[in-house]
Amino acid sequence: MLILMRKNNTLFLLFAFCLFINTSAKGQTVQMLEQIGHLLDDAIFYSDRYITPATDVAVYQASSNWVTTPKKKKLWETSLSFHTNAFFVPKSDRKFTINNSDFSFFTIENASTAIVPTALGNNTQVWLVGQLDDGQNQTQVRVKAANGINQETVIYPYLQASLGLWHGTELVAKYSTNVKLKKCHYQVYGIGLKHNFSQYFKKIEAKNIYFSGLISYSKEDITFNFLDAQTDYGNLGLNEITGLVDTWQFQINASKQWKRFELMSALISNTSDFKYEVGGPKGQIEDLIPFQSLVNKKLEEIYKTKTNWIGELSGRYQISKIYVQTSVAFGKFVNSNFSIQYEF
């Protein structure tokens, strides 16, 4: 039933856009429209399997080290820190298996099954082929399966700042420019509010034990090189695929301090909304049908919402007004974070 609904949605989109097709496309056959519909379905299937592991990773990277210490900041006390995330990519998320039975338009060239990389995987030499027939001519669509970033560890930097407000509340913000990693671009920015609760328990704070809560919002954008699909109608406009992730996070932190060293733990819960879009140069096929727009409309079918529970451990050492901290977040994945902080 779900497959039937997806095919019906595709045909409806094609019919709606056909109302605007110019005169050069009036000779299109119903057969070609059905083929384009199958091509769209295959593009959505492949996109989902390819980029989902990477957007899951982005959530872990954005969730790390929001709280550098649960201790209460004085009013207007400020800190600025430089962070570096290091994410270790599991082998299971670096590849996936495709079969000819997964596709309605493409077939795997010279094979019935193949292992191809996700966005986090390595390079591949697998090709997908299909035929478009407009009733007069046939054109081959031959696409090389997308390569991954070919890295077992994904590293990226960002800046974070915090400002002490009233009654033990703290404003926290993190930001990175559009960082170019190997074969992809990544950007994260977010804002949060932390509140210190141990201030209400003086006997506990007297033992150098502190705890706090934080609520935050972050946005992660991650873009990968995707499918360079060349046809007689030009490029299909699938050269890039972007994952757009919006995350709300709540966490509680507790720490114990021994002189200059502070050991901290955290329990994190976050909920993320995932959206996707493709981009790239548009070819002559756009004169026949707005293919890229159709793909992006179809990608709405794989929008999703996920909730994660993450644990975090960290150690922080003070050197005058400078702090050095390392942390490890763990759950489905493992992400480490190293930071240098300066308190004004």
Q: What are the language-model segments listed below?
A:
Residues M1-M32:
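Bacterial Sec-dependent N-terminal signal peptides
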Residues K74-W76, E152-P157, H185-I191, K207, ...:
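Residues that define the transmembrane beta-barrel architecture of outer-membrane proteins
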Residues T68-W76, K91, K183, S198-F211, ...:
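Short loop/turn motifs that connect adjacent beta-strands in outer-membrane beta-barrel proteins
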Residues T69, L80-F82, L159-L165, I191-F197, ...:
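Residues on the lipid-exposed face of transmembrane beta-strands in outer-membrane beta-barrel proteins
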Residues T84-F88, Y175-V179, F197, I215-D221, ...:
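Transmembrane beta-strands of outer-membrane beta-barrel pores
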Residues I204, Y210-N253, Q257-K259:
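Outer-membrane beta-barrel translocator/channel fold
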